[in-house]
Amino acid sequence: MTATPREFDIVLYGATGFVGKLTAEYLARAGGDARIALAGRSTQRVLAVREALGESAQTWPILTADASLPSTLQAMAARAQVVVTTVGPYTRYGLPLVAACAAAGTDYADLTGEPMFMRNSIDLYHKQAADTGARIVHACGFDSVPSDLSVYALYHAAREDGAGELTDTNCVVRSFKGGFSGGTIASMLEVLSTASNDPDARRQLSDPYMLSPDRGAEPELGPQPDLPSRRGRRLAPELAGVWTAGFIMAPTNTRIVRRSNALLDWAYGRRFRYSETMSVGSTVLAPVVSVVGGGVGNAMFGLASRYIRLLPRGLVKRVVPKPGTGPSAAARERGYYRIETYTTTTTGARYLARMAQDGDPGYKATSVLLGECGLALALDRDKLSDMRGVLTPAAAMGDALLERLPAAGVSLQTTRLAS
């Protein structure tokens, strides 16, 4: 909660990047009367972005801010109700802006999928942000809004029915079309590089509760692997015949969901277990893909987290998409995702949440989700939680997002299943 009115409802920082431009385009369409400004290192490049946005954005002010110059971030944060940032990898560039927003009592939303960055943000700035009234909300894109909000919706459905707390909860990516942005790949490489160079970070990354506000208070529920391969019928009867394998974003998404549960005072339940997998179909080859794919994925992740530092950085950069690059508009329009999340409660009741969105998940869908998170923080303040500090999307604005996202083309429906 800011002490005095701010000049801007939202400042979009990183507007010249690929996803930054898409987010600016979305805000120009959906921002309504919100007072929006664009920010970046180069005034000329930001001006060029604004000129391409159409008439509604031509009066948006331009701010100059640079991650290497903390004073510019502080000045930007002091003028904004909310700062929305697409400038990553966040491990490398993110903490100075978190610091500026925490000090100024300014709400913040980003796209990070980097657990160690989030852990550092929590350790360094959670208390200060709570004291100043800032909401620092990480993972506001495809990772991890669909995962986080689906479970939050299931919790609401079970609570309204008086059906008890959530126990085994499994998210399955049923279908997915699209790629991962250059920025997302850069973030993944940053995670692996951090783990490779720092044994303590590698140990923390292996902890399913590494983002918990109180690690000692978390229940011991046995192994919770990040990249499991499972038969669908083990997850839910409705998935009989389907095989699943590990989902690449699960190591981040699962930790966000578990942090949400803890921030909400374990409202989902003390026996809440959460996993994510991706459907590989029901063909005769599906079991092979599930088992081999899962084994290879776990092996590659384990090796990369230890030895990626030995690869020449120039070689790595040549073989992965560059940050700021992405597919054509037509390709982005062809993308989509469909996820299903199944849960069983302590009373034996079963529920399903289906979430779907059109648009490439790493680009178009992410820009919509980030834009809506920024708008919720700025405009729906009476619907936000009372919590302050370093939060998750569900803990900070779960109710506001459940109300806001359908109008943005995001479908999320919960159903009670036969027990």
From Swiss-Prot:
The chain crosses the membrane at residues 284-304. It holds the Pfam family Sacchrp_dh_NADP. GO terms for molecular function: oxidoreductase activity. It is a single-pass membrane protein. One of its GO terms (cellular component) is plasma membrane. There is a cross-link at K127 (Isoglutamyl lysine isopeptide (Lys-Gln) (interchain with Q-Cter in protein Pup)). Residues 197-232 are annotated as: Disordered. Keywords: Cell membrane, Isopeptide bond, Membrane, Oxidoreductase, Transmembrane, Transmembrane helix, Ubl conjugation. This is Putative trans-acting enoyl reductase Rv2449c. Its EC number is 1.3.1.-. Belongs to the saccharopine dehydrogenase family. Enoyl reductase subfamily. It is found in: Cell membrane. PANTHER family: SACCHAROPINE DEHYDROGENASE-LIKE OXIDOREDUCTASE. It is an enzyme of class 1 (oxidoreductase).
